[in-house]
Amino acid sequence: MSSSCNVGASAGGGGSVVMETSNFAHVIFQNVGKSFLPQAALECHYTLTPFITPHPKDWVGIFKVGWSSARDYYTFLWSPMPENYTEGSTVHRTIIFQGYYVPRSDGEFYQFCYVTHTGEIRGASTPFQFRPATPTGEELLTVEDDGNSDILVRVEEVQQECKELQKALRLLTQERDQLQEKQRQQNQELQKSLIEEKEEAQSRVRQLEQDLLKITQKAVLKETELDCLRDKLQKVISERDSLQTQLKNERDERELYKSHVRSAELENTKLSAELQMLKAVELNREVTIAQYQEELHRLRTERDTHPAETGLKEQLRQAEEQLQATRQQAAMLGSELRDASGGRDRTMTELYRVRQEAEELRAHLAEAQEECRHAQDQLDRMKNQTSQEMGRAGGGVGVASELEAELQKEVEELKLRLNMAAEHYKEKYRECQRLRRQVTKLTQQQETQQGDANRNDASTETTLELHTPDAETPSESYPAEIKTVARDVEKSRDEEGNEQEEEDEEEEECSLSVEAELACMEEKWREQCTINENLKLLLANEEKRFKTQVAEKDREVSALRESLVVVTKEKERLEKQYMREGTTRSRRLEVREPVVLRYPLPYPQDPPPLPLVPQQPAELQFGNPYLEQETRDGADGALSPEQTCRPPPLAPPPWGGPVVCSQPSRSLSPPDGLENPTEERPTGGDGEAPAVCEHQSLESNESHTSFCFDTRPDVHKQCPLCEVIFPPHFEQSSFERHVESHWRVCPVCSEQFPLDCQQQLYEKHVHTHFDGNVLNFDNFD
């Protein structure tokens, strides 16, 4: 039913009014008479029905019958705002028009109209006139004129007025009949539509109540699941905190191990330098001992020929004292060497223990990540179920809103960024695999982490809006019963008018009861919708909060994963560096030091006498007594000067297990039954020591080039590659480091590569030493 109102009036024929069905019944004017006194105070009584909401700017005006808009008022008064007004209630109000505002007696018809602040006319009264009171018989005057004729005053005026009123009455009666017929038809249609709307609303309310009950039950179940997930999340957070604490402890231990490694490196460097120096001293002392022994033998042979026996005895005693001191120094050097080997073994044991603790930490982190992934999967399943159930409860919900589209776009962007991060992680992971193939367990855990990184932890939220049906409350217009103007017509139509009024009152009461019931149902529906909206908001807030917590947890786990990767890489680098240094130290320690003989030297019985010269050549004239001990066990043999300059072995022996254990120094002397090919040693003149040999095995020549360095302190050292000359007293270790800097050395087999060698070839060679097992060096080149 339309809520607009139109009032039309025809100016001709005494101002007859044609009114259509409108909203004029929203304000009902009461006790409106047929006429009022002009220039006198006028009371206006009206009732505000529940279909109108009063406003302080509403007003009541006096309009001439035939007005066309709200601006055609004669005068008006503001409608007072009722006190303690309740929406939907009926209010009775009264206003008084002062006498100087009331129109004069002009024979026109007027009516009250209620105008809202928006300019809509929501109520109109029956027409009335402003005229003086009807004169009685006593008020009639008889006037005698010159023709002695009596003239009745006001008779003609009254007769004319009576004719106009009768004509207006006929028009109003016809209009009333038409309006009554039209009203009956509209009432029937309205009643039918109200019944249909009521039944539809009731069925809709029942359906919504059932849906609300189902949603409430499901919300309780989801709340229970959320509580379980919160408990699991709390456990994961506690485990994460413990892992963080453990990681912090590991970092502290790593720093401590770093400091220990640095101190051990410094100590090893110092011990290596001392060992080289002691080896050089020992070699010099060995040569000196041989010289003294030869001199002693010569002196014994000349003792019979020289009378100065006392001087010879003194020289012999001094030589024996020097020999004893040399033996003591050799014993001290052996003790220091054993201490250095024990320190190396302790350092390797600590490094292995650090590796085991790192593996345990990685296992704990993998378990925590698996629990996080399981909790995230449960949360995703719960969100999908909630979105599907909310979609079914929403009924005919339209397409997703713009907010959904924006959220979907953000989710796609997050997925793209996650994929890019996963690709970057894959590259880093492949690089780590190339550098460390021997750690199988760590590889499997990293592959599991790679699979977890591709998982999408972003879910799409669906916003459902329940649209409440707009129950269009129909409005009714009940035109007031037109009363008769003349007393004679009023008496004849009195009974019919009373019956019509009773019928109108009954219909109005029925309509009001139906409207009140509909209003009550509408109010209940609004309350239910409010409750549903509140439940949806609570559920959405809870899901958002849980999502935020899960995202924070994921970020923290990612940070822990990144820090663990950094720690792992740092530890691998330290392990490789320490392994290279340990391998280098082990190769240096494998060169056995000369052993002092326990038994006297087997001198020849009849050597030719030789004169004593001030500077005896370094080479023994009777041969090296140690070369005759080749048939002895390799453990008791000593190194010849040729053997001392041999390069270290290409690779350490294979280890039986991953445990770093202390290995005894290996003897480089040949086994029993084999002959060690000797090479001629050129002798130098004028007291020069024999030149250093350049022994290289055939295998060494095929694989790489090794250098033998002259350790004599009185010879200028020259780099064989860059031809840089160093002073005689330049440190031997610094000179060796300078020569080795021209090459890239394999950290496992010490094979040398030129600096311009391709990186891929160098890495391929290094990788060939590993087969994926920890500390397995069986596949050395």
Curated annotation (Swiss-Prot):
Tissues with expression: Little expression is observed during pectoral fin development, except for an elevated level of expression in the distal mesenchyme cells of some samples.
Acidic residues: compositionally biased ranges: 496-510
Top-level division of the source organism's lineage: Eukaryota
Chain positions recorded as Zn(2+) 2 binding sites: 746, 749, 765, 769
InterPro entries found in the cross-reference section: CALCOCO1-like (IPR012852), CALCOCO1/2_Zn_UBZ1 (IPR041641), SKICH (IPR041611), UBA_autophagy_assoc_protein (IPR051002)
Residues that bind Zn(2+) 1: 719, 722, 738, 742
Sequence ranges of Basic and acidic residues compositional bias: 484-495
Biased composition (Pro residues): 646-656
Keywords: Apoptosis, Coiled coil, Metal-binding, Repeat, Zinc, Zinc-finger
Zinc finger (UBZ1-type) in chain: 716-742, 743-769
Coiled coil: 148-453, 488-581
A UniProt-annotated Pfam family: SKICH
Region entry Disordered, spans: 441-510, 630-691
One function term, GO molecular function aspect: zinc ion binding
Described function: May have anti-apoptotic activity.
PANTHER family documented for this protein: SKICH DOMAIN-CONTAINING PROTEIN, TAX1-BINDING PROTEIN 1 HOMOLOG A
Name this polypeptide is given: Tax1-binding protein 1 homolog A
Gene name, Swiss-Prot/TrEMBL: tax1bp1a
